[in-house]
Amino acid sequence: WSRQAFEKEFNLDYSYRFVLEEEGEIIGYAVVWQIYDEATIMSIAIKKDRWGKGYGKRLMKFLIEYFKGKVSRFVLDVRRSNIRAIRLYQSIGFKIISERRGYYSDGEDAFQMTLELEENGGDKGKAFEAVNTGG
């Protein structure tokens, strides 16, 4: 995302921004829109030198815990070529529900994925705990 896009997020009532930091260093972030009972992960990233160390999973679990009881499902779009992210999302319980042809500006397709939560705010068949994202 561009700096301008991030700055615009701060003016949206339905936009939530999260930062994952370790020892004062920002190593990841997420932007989530909550509209009614649905949380859409608009953007999520972990610094490349931290890939494969569980930070993405920790951040995703934190998001699910944070929105428990507030939403009935999560939705996200992911590049078809981003196998690492797709596997992460599937390991947490996300399912591919559709393919969006030419979704990205470079023409790449996207998968739309969802995680359905139970009415009590829990997810179906998985147990998550909150994680400390810094400080």
Label every PLM stretch briefly:
Residues 84, 121-122:
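Residue-level signal for secondary-structure boundary sites
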Residues 43-61, 79-87, 91-92:
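Conserved glycine-rich acetyl-CoA-binding loop
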Residues 67-77:
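Conserved GNAT acetyl-CoA-binding A-motif
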Residues 37, 48, 76-86, 102-107:
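Conserved beta-strand-loop-alpha-helix junction that forms the acyl-donor binding cleft
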Residues 75-77, 90, 95-111, 133:
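Conserved catalytic-core motifs of GNAT/GCN5-like acyltransferases
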Residues 1-51, 60-67, 98, 116-121, ...:
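Acetyl-CoA-dependent GNAT
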